[in-house]
Amino acid sequence: MTQDKCPFKEQPSQPNFAGGGTSNKDWWPDRLKLNILRQHTAVSNPLDADFDYAAAFKSLDYEALKKDLRALMTDSQDWWPADFGHYGGLFIRMAWHSAGTYRVFDGRGGAGQGQQRFAPLNSWPDNVSLDKARRLLWPIKQKYGNKISWADLMILTGNVALESMGFKTFGFAGGRPDTWEADEATYWGRETTWLGNDARYAKGFSGSDKRGTLIADEDSHKTTHSRELETPLAAAHMGLIYVNPEGPDGNPDPIAAAHDIRDTFGRMAMNDEETVALIAGGHTFGKTHGAAPADNVGKEPEAAGLEAQGLGWANKHGSGKGPDTITSGLEVTWTKTPTQWSNNFLEYLFKFEWELTKSPAGAHQWVAKNADEIIPHAYDASKKRKPTMLTTDLSLRFDPAYEKIARRFLEHPDQFADAFARAWFKLTHRDMGPRARYLGPEVPSEVLIWQDPIPAVNHPLVDASDIATLKDEILASGVPFRSFISTAWAAASTFRGSDKRGGANGARIRLAPQRDWEANNQPWLREALSALEAVQSRFNSRGDGKKVSLADLIVLAGCAAVEKAAQDAGHPIKVPFVPGRMDASQEETDVQSFSHMEPFADGFRNFAKGPARPRAEHYLVDKAQLLNLSAPEMTVLVGGLRVLNTNYDGSAHGVFTSRPGALSNDFFVHLLDMNTAWKDAGNGELFEGSDRKTGGKKWTATRADLVFGSNAELRAIAEVYASNDGDMKFVKDFVAAWNKVMNLDRFDLKGKQTIPARL
């Protein structure tokens, strides 16, 4: 008898209590991660159930808070002294790294939940010393309590830091309620070493076990990795926000670094001008820290001992702070006025020729040739240094497109200041969603295209009588009801709880690029929109001032069709509807930005393409998480949408019913029927169900169908709906979940700024 190799790595000593020991994840690492549908609920939130963050923020003495933050900037503490007597550079980096994890593909990351406080972000090599920044802020957070979240405070502090150093910002919006646990839904990469990128790139770098510094790799890796960064990632290395400042994989090549910069910043929604403005503007202030080699740096916060109290990277070099600080391993101060806004960065970038050198920690950086020592020392006023730059700074000079922009900014400082102000605002607010969520006295009045603007309601809304009339007209239009349901779902399910983008409001389903997405059945979409536009035209031409938007009609049509389907199944029920949506124009829609939201898969519609198909069930859970759904909500929606016959291509996969179009619990009844035997149809993506006795073919199904009978937790939920007493509960739960999805983007209704509940 042979002994199989253990399916998991040997683990450090674990307690035999409190969840210790070998876990299901250890045994089956590829198991469906339903835990991401159970996060950020009332169970983990210490605040009262009726706590309203928006109301709390509005009661904040905002100017007093900003005054306290300004005072903190120059209140240097012995336990962590301020460079140049000013914490501005540190706090700008804190805010930047809080927001800079955002990526366009799934909207995850960003500043919106204050996740920098939790693992893994609190222990990333790129966030060394930001643990100290947050501790410097604690007395102010303690003073103002729940009136300002950590998520808002970190961004506001970055703004105040800029203002205190003479820069005029574009504005600030609050409205980021905190979460209370580490986010487990975001994919940060598969590498198992800090700074590694051998999984996200072909020919990548295996990483390092060193902590806290970016030591150039001199021996094992001389070939720059390929340029195809894994989707949805937006960082070149595990544990970095964007790129390696030494250059790709530690190779000091400014041209190659420009490729990485353009890719990663683009995946964070920044164009070339915004990228140049952010790098040049941000590096106008402060310095980097690399006083000594990496072996002086201790464990990161998550690995440090209890006595460290959540701090990490203890530094045994000298005093371990001030002039002895080790953060990135680079030792660069960009300008002669590191606590004042200036054009020095761009002036020096083009004025000097640059020579490759190394920091005291051994990291590649650049020093100005034949330059005078004009750069101040952070802690000794009697000392000066030559100007220094990072490899990625020089990219702004040697990449032709970046150089053109940088020279224009050099010649036109006013354009540079405006571009940096706007790019900084976009960086720090990109994941907040619509302006309806913005709070505070410094919200800028200018409406920006990346905010996905929707016109304000400018007419009387339809009332209950109008709604009833419209529903009757819609149902009598002759359009198959599944087209209305499919269109409503296609519109509403674009919502992402990550960055609060998408949803039915705006009716962008009729505009490029959404109208052309493969997942949106084109004939069904066209016939539904054509019928609804005719209904809208007739209603809005009545002359009584009342109007109805196409966005409202899309949702109303779906609701009316669901009501009819429930009635046809013998379960009359009212599907809620609240008007107030408006229609966006094509000019108000950033096509490139929205193109990133096109789904690879949507298991609710049995849609998956390319590499998504073999993992359709995992994509389904990911989609459910973005829709703020719980496992029961996901389950009931899939079961309902199947019997409503709304597969994106009209196929019968998973349509386990003899009465398609009726809102019944048939999907669950037939899925769990032990008289059906399932077999793989040959590719692991499609399955056939046959009668166990006769062998006759009964059903076909995808992975997104059979997972509800295969996965133990989902099967337990499915059993509730498949039971003899589960039919009415199924209909009620489906309608509740449907209504939730239809209104995920209705921040105008919610009032409260909370993390949407997973019921």
UniProtKB/Swiss-Prot annotation:
It catalyses: H2O2 + AH2 = A + 2 H2O; 2 H2O2 = O2 + 2 H2O. Binds 1 heme b (iron(II)-protoporphyrin IX) group per monomer. Pfam families: peroxidase. Its cofactor is heme b. PANTHER family: CATALASE-PEROXIDASE, HYDROPEROXIDASE I, BIFUNCTIONAL CATALASE-PEROXIDASE. Bifunctional enzyme with both catalase and broad-spectrum peroxidase activity. This is Catalase-peroxidase. It comes from Neosartorya fischeri (strain ATCC 1020 / DSM 3700 / CBS 544.65 / FGSC A1164 / JCM 1740 / NRRL 181 / WB 181).
